């Protein structure tokens, strides 16, 4: 299977399936000399971990990460970092009744058509279980970006179905089960999901993100524009169906006199572009939104076919998230960290000695 790696200079390759013995990744290109421990990575994994609240899948995985290589006496060595998480709470029998059925909205049909076979246990490689390793790798990139460059990455639940976060309190994001900056909205989300779970249905979500402390100059035009690589990274996350950078789709109704971010010696006057101009970071905050579809695994009967093309009714049992947007928040942060880290290293490799005639203006 091709397509299991991301990045050029800071490259991450993941492996493993939902119900296999383990999942893992190789992080290649991490600079040497950075302090790193399993605890540094575990902090991020615990935010994504299944079973952390009643509103997510009740699969109980500890997600304890093991560092296999690339770290010696607490410091990164510059060699490939091997990470492993052992799967401990698989229930493959939950899928035995649907092993010959195509679940609507899932990758069952396309995997079978592409590979001629498929791992029906929890979706195999197509499962969001794989994203745990992205979060693990992203924790390494995020630590470097924060400590070396002062880059801060923050994502949050901005909308769940009809419920919007109307207030923004950054401190509140870590104080509720939804990573929501609006305490009142988080309460409404909890009530909404309780009812939805009883119905056996699911709901979509929108995750917003902001990266502050961005260096100027990251991005490789024309095909590796910063927002292009971010879009690819976001669209690689299970269930993501759309991404908007800056003002996103609102630009359709904007005029150029409004949208163009005016500049002065004192700094930018607005940030409709979302921190990227011509595919290169401007030094302003990088802002984006990601739309996430409803979970396809629901207990409501749906029409489908089996592997022989015969009509069938599908009811998905097992343990599933009624809203995958909740656990997508740390995944979005991780993917942002991986892309920004990779582009910083690429920029440094070519342009480390560049002296622009004008110092960066304030963001």
UniProtKB/Swiss-Prot annotation:
Binding of NADP(+), residues: 48, 54
Record flagged with keyword Lyase: yes
Keywords per UniProt: Amino-acid biosynthesis, Aromatic amino acid biosynthesis, FAD, Flavoprotein, FMN, Lyase, NADP
HAMAP family cross-referenced by the UniProt entry: Chorismate_synth
Matches recorded under CDD domains: Chorismate_synthase (cd07304)
Gene: aroC
Source organism per UniProt: Acidithiobacillus ferrooxidans (strain ATCC 23270 / DSM 14882 / CIP 104768 / NCIMB 8455)
Record-annotated disulphide pairs: none
EC number(s) per entry: 4.2.3.5
Name of the protein in its database record: Chorismate synthase
């Amino acid at each position: 299977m091709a397509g299991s790696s991301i990045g050029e200079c800071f490259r991450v390759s993941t492996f493993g399936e939902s119900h296999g013995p383990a999942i893992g990744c190789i992080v290649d290109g991490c600079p040497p000399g950075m302090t790193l421990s399993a605890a540094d990575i575990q902090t991020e994994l615990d935010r994504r971990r299944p079973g952390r609240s009643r509103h997510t899948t009740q699969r109980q995985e500890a997600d304890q990460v093991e560092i296999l290589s690339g770290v010696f006496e607490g410091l990164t060595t510059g060699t490939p970092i091997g990470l492993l998480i052992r799967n401990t709470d698989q229930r493959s029998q939950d899928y035995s009744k649907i092993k010959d059925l195509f679940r609507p909205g899932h990758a069952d049909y396309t995997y079978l058509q592409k590979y001629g076979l498929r791992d029906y246990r929890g979706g195999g490689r197509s499962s969001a279980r794989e994203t745990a390793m992205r979060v693990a790798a992203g924790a390494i990139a995020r630590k470097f970006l924060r400590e070396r460059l002062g880059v801060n990455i923050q994502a949050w639940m901005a909308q769940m179905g009809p419920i919007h976060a109307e207030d923004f309190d950054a401190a509140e994001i870590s104080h509720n089960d939804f990573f929501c900056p609006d305490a009142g909205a988080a309460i409404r989300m909890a009530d909404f999901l309780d009812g939805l779970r009883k119905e056996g249905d699911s709901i979509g979500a929108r995750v917003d993100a902001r990266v502050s402390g961005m260096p100027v100059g990251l991005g490789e035009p024309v095909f590796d524009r910063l927002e292009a690589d971010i879009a690819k990274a976001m669209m690689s996350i299970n269930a993501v169906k759309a991404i908007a950078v800056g003002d996103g789709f609102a630009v359709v109704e904007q005029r150029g006199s409004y949208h163009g971010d005016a500049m002065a010696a004192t700094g930018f006057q607005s940030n409709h572009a979302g921190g990227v101009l011509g595919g290169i970071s401007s030094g302003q905050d990088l802002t984006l939104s990601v739309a996430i579809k409803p979970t396809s695994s629901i207990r409501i009967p749906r029409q489908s076919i089996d592997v022989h093309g015969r009509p069938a009714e599908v009811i998905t049992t097992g343990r599933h998230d009624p809203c995958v947007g909740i656990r997508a928040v740390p995944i979005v942060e991780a993917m942002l960290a991986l892309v920004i880290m990779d582009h910083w290293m690429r920029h440094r490799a070519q342009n480390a000695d560049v002296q622009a005639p004008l110092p960066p203006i304030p963001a």
